[in-house]
Amino acid sequence: MRPYSFPDVGRCWIAGCLAGLLVFGWVAPTLASDASDAKSVAPSGPPPQDALTRSGFEHYYDLDFETAISDFEKVLKAHPDDPFAANHLVSAVFYCELYRVGALDTSLYATNSFLAKKKFPFDAKVSAQIKELMERGLALSEQRLALDPQDVQALYVRGLTRGLRAEYLALVDKAWFAALRNALGARRDHEEVLRLAPDYADAKTVLGVHYYVAGSLPWTVKAAASLVGLGWSRKKGIQYLYDAANAGGETSADARIALALFLRREHRFDEALAAVRILIAAHPRNYLYALEEANLLKDAGRGPEAVAAYRKVLATGRQGNVYYHPHLEMAAFGLGEALRGQNDFAGAAGAYESVRQASTADSDLVESANLAAGEMYDLLQQRDLAVKKYQAVITANASSPSAETARRHLKEPYRNP
């Protein structure tokens, strides 16, 4: 094996951080506040919310991004000098676009496979808006810190915006060095927040993710990471996330979903399910939370329950009045995987076939679904259908790993391992 280079450190670090912070959003819902607020007694969390900010975040966590953006635009207009208001709006715009392009599927981040994925196709105008709002938020934070370097709220929101920029640079620009610098800046800001205000539990969400990620790196990468001052502890990371989740603060939901993802990696499925079910109870219109419950049941080996959960998600999504713009192709593919695990090859083939019928389906997911459907047809001894699926995979992207697998299956029918 070749040794890890510095780019590997950045890629592995960002991969883990994105896994914890990206999937369901990382943002601090707070009331726009004046800089004078920061000089009071050390705060235990972000400032309280106003009615419009609360409304924005209710819509945000329901995945009704359009309404959330409208609310946050009004807040920023009323408080143009507040870095929190800028952070809220850019977060909603960014995650709205990520959701549109199918980048919030947890399956992408359960492993590091997304590192090799092509850039997500962001709309150019949206990208420009995101960059402008991030720069505005950072500038407003810096203005407050210039007046008071120990302004806890300014440090906190600067850390949030730096983290958001790290996600954008990694996913959209694939700029790993720049993403790593911003991720480290976010971590250091929130470490300083806890030093100045030890009861500021919301800062533990970011730090919990970072500590867990660093503790999960290969030892060779840890050695390189230590050169830039990165400590690590998976146990401490998970405990920090539990602390933030149980504190009931502004990042409680974000801490729970990071917990669910990391506990899934630890095979602590019951704990992960408990975290997700709390989120579902609080936000029953959030399609991704419901999908994550089904994913966890599948990964836990609870096949029949997973099948039922995926079917419930699909049925609810097709009603058209519960979830906002659900990417049902994600649930269809998950259903195929769950049915495959139950040796229901005909049912799995049907589920995989339905993936390409969704207008929102990502081309990579369609490719994976076609390959999987072909394998099911081979197991069902329907070779003609299998061959058509393999040919479709190769036609879509002849240089992909799926195409290489499809070529092997064209030479020899797929058989169950």
Task: Show where each model-derived region lies.
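Bacterial N-terminal signal peptides
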Residues: 13-26
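TPR/TPR-like (Sel1-like) alpha-helical repeat modules
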Residues: 187, 191, 212, 229-233, ...
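TPR alpha-solenoid repeat register
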Residues: 85, 154, 203, 255, ...
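Canonical positions in the second alpha-helix
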Residues: 75, 144, 193, 243-244, ...
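Short solvent-exposed coil/turn linkers within tandem alpha-helical repeat scaffolds
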Residues: 78-82, 147, 196-197, 248-250, ...
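Short coil/linker segments at helix-helix boundaries
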Residues: 35-52, 59-71, 81, 92-150, ...
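"A position-specific structural signal for the A-helix of alpha-solenoid helical repeats
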Residues: 54, 88, 95, 157, ...
